[in-house]
Amino acid sequence: MPRKHLIANQTNKKQQTSAKQLQKLAKRIASAVKKGGTNIQSNPHLKVAVDLALAKGLSMDSIKRNIHGSEKDTTKISEFCYEIFGPNGVGIIVFGLTDNPNRLLSSLNGYLAKLKGQLAKPNSVKINFQEEGIIFVNKNNYLKDDLIELLILDNINLIDVDYDEECFEISLHSNSYFHAKELLKKNNFSIVDSEIKLVPLLTVDLDRNQQTLLSRFLNACEEDDDIQFVVHNANPWEE
């Protein structure tokens, strides 16, 4: 299935990382530290959180300050994953990190009422998603076949390579993500954006009214300090 919109949305948002996004990244780092300590290499949760923070423009100095500050912070941060069915059966997954679970659930119920959606049973939505690494790199005078050969010869578990005039979009199994990034850097590729994310296996179409409802839901979640990110399987549309 076409994948360009997956990374394109991320690239557009990266142009200007908001203060709220920075706060959410800091909270994700804090949660990861509380889970597994401050060593980036031995704590897989922290490694992913740091990688995302770097991709969104945070400096390593800022990240290190967040890590050390989180080590001393005694605030309990709880992690939540809510699965939702929205208009026309669109599947939605909401990931939250909060020090107040009741506040998060209350807010989410309010958003759901306006969406005309409902909470789903565990794994009833997740089953339609798979975790992938997405890496967006400048073409660097490479041909697509040459890039594929480079990745496969180094045992990268590749899913797909797509491209436009300037960039390649590489989709791969998440267990090859960090290996692939190092390989690309060694071969002088400039990484524009990258992330491990959930990608839908099947997508659904929404009509204009349903698109509006989902857009409002996504905007509300984006403004909520307790919600880290949201994924869904609706086909993209023009705002």
Curated annotation (Swiss-Prot):
Superkingdom to which the source organism belongs: Bacteria
Keywords recorded for this protein, A-Z: Cytoplasm, DNA-binding, Transcription, Transcription regulation
Molecular function GO labels: DNA binding
GO biological process: regulation of DNA-templated transcription
Stretches of the chain forming a coiled coil according to its record: none
Protein localization: Cytoplasm
SUPFAM superfamilies xref list: YebC-like
Main location: cytoplasm
Keyword Signal: no
InterPro entries reported for this sequence: Integrase-like_N (IPR017856), TACO1_YebC-like_2nd/3rd_dom (IPR048300), TACO1_YebC_N (IPR049083), Transcrip_reg_TACO1-like (IPR002876), Transcrip_reg_TACO1-like_dom3 (IPR026564), YebC-like (IPR029072)
Gene Ontology CC terms, in alphabetical order: cytosol
NCBIfam families with a match to the protein in the record: PRK12378.1, YebC/PmpR family DNA-binding transcriptional regulator
Family statement: Belongs to the TACO1 family.
Protein name (database record): Probable transcriptional regulatory protein MG332
